[in-house]
């Protein structure tokens, strides 16, 4: 009881839901405004009937005696599930109880200690084979395996057909001709002689004259005319050798010489570099549940016979070309109840087509094979056309699709490498 409760001497009684839980002021609402039965003594007319005059809160009274236990309350609603508590310590084993009903599957507990080996149980009834699971995701590419041992040499093949005549080769460069010999110095020409005029006859001696005075120098005479050309002289001595002459024109190609004697065997060369063997192949089949595949879509080959390199994609039902080169593809289709038209498709282009017109319960086989040159990134698959989708498979008959790399492309030598 609180400060607002009635005194112990009051004879007023109320039901459990007398007072309302909503208040307009701090005062307690009058009992007449609440539902339920109650009794009011006339001496208690001082009780607050009006919200305008709320009573003041008095001091807290002494704690009363403990009342009798009330009747059990109604069961409340189911509470929210609590959080999972931590695993407690393992208690001592209790006595074996009676087998209870099977409870709900609980969370997986921690792995316990290994118990003692039990007695062999009664063999159970063999279960039914489970349904086939969905194909798993494509695994990561495995690491490179070790190089295999060198195989035995194969048998010698039959001689090939005569090849076509090759085109005429280009004109070769000028050959290293011999340099011409140094020419001899030409002979020196003869010295020409000038003819001398004939000497005149001597005149008679004159009288001796007296010594005359020294005369002045006379005027210098004019140069005389050149004499006539002399005759050819004798051959002179041999002169020194002249300068080397220019390079002569290349001579004609000589005849092929005789084959020389075989030389001695050369030393053993260093070991060559190891070449990684490139492989790419697949072989898949059709499960009976995939018979009569939908047309114009890649046929879903689920039965994998070989896919060692992982180049066949089972999710897309396509072969992914990883190495450029020449590939061989073949397919063998069992036909039943309806005709079939199949096509080998490369990047959306139908390269090879096959048809087999069959009706009724007869069974037939349609097959084909082709060599294709493909590049890195190409995709190859098999599909049926329109409503001619009689591809069939059973426990006795298979429809297969296979392919492998026949030989990869090789690097072509450049002009500099040829030199």
UniProtKB/Swiss-Prot annotation:
UniProt keyword annotations, A-Z: Collagen, Extracellular matrix, Glycoprotein, Repeat, Secreted, Signal
Signal sequence bounds: 1-19
One family name in Pfam for this protein: C1q
Subcellular compartments: Secreted, Extracellular space, Extracellular matrix
Record field: compositional bias (Basic and acidic residues): 129-144, 184-202
Entries under PANTHER family matching the protein: C1Q DOMAIN-CONTAINING PROTEIN, EMILIN ELASTIN MICROFIBRIL INTERFACE-LOCATED PROTEIN ELASTIN MICROFIBRIL INTERFACER
Protein name: Inner ear-specific collagen
